[in-house]
Design a protein with these regions (language model features):
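Terminal helix/beta-alpha structural elements that buttress the NAD(P)+-binding lobe
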Residues: 1-181
């Protein structure tokens, strides 16, 4: 998403888990900055990286990252919600302070636009997306990294590793030999 934002002329700040991943996001993917969400001073680093606030936040994580983003929203900011990975492995509701009132206050104060983002809602745009994305990948404007794991039997452990941030790239489970190469 950040690479597309850069193509469209936006400033892009990424969030990743660890210095190696952050370096990749900046040096290989071309983001303007990337903040390690595991850093003790993550919130301060994010605020420094976004001195003019945040206009669009593509939500995939929730948890600490979302909490750090909320006070940085600009008026009329947009937040498409595509995932909440920090909550996927939760078996109970979080304890402690309820963060919903802070989010609702931000929605009101900053006139935020929050909308669920489900890919099938944009099926009518699929041909355009495939054309554009294919060209961007061929031109090297969009890059990707795969974290390949052989064998379907390794899928459960790989999923648990994904939830812990142990992967580096898009997880691909190889269930048979690659016929292309």
């Amino acid at each position: 998403v950040g690479q597309i934002a850069k193509i469209k002329g936006c400033r892009a700040v990424g969030v990743a888990g660890g210095p190696e991943k952050c370096a990749y996001v900046v040096n290989e993917l071309g983001f303007d900055a990337c903040i390690d969400h595991r850093a003790d001073d993550f919130e301060a680093q994010l605020a420094t990286a976004c001195p003019d606030g945040i206009d669009i936040y593509f939500e995939n994580v929730a948890g600490r990252v979302l909490e750090a983003v909320i006070p940085l929203f600009n008026f009329w900011a947009r937040m498409p919600v595509c995932g909440l990975i920090a909550q996927y492995s939760m078996t109970d509701l979080p304890t402690g302070t309820n963060k919903l009132p802070a989010l609702m206050r931000a929605v009101l104060t900053y006139r935020l636009h929050i909308e669920g983002f489900i890919v099938r809602d944009f099926a009518d745009m699929q041909a355009d997306f495939r054309r554009d994305m294919g060209q961007w990948v061929r031109d090297g404007q969009v890059k990707y990294k795969e974290h390949r794991v052989a064998g379907l039997e390794n899928a459960p452990a790989t999923l648990m590793g994904l939830l812990k941030g142990e992967n580096f790239g898009k997880v691909v489970i190889e269930v048979s030999d690659d016929p292309t190469g």
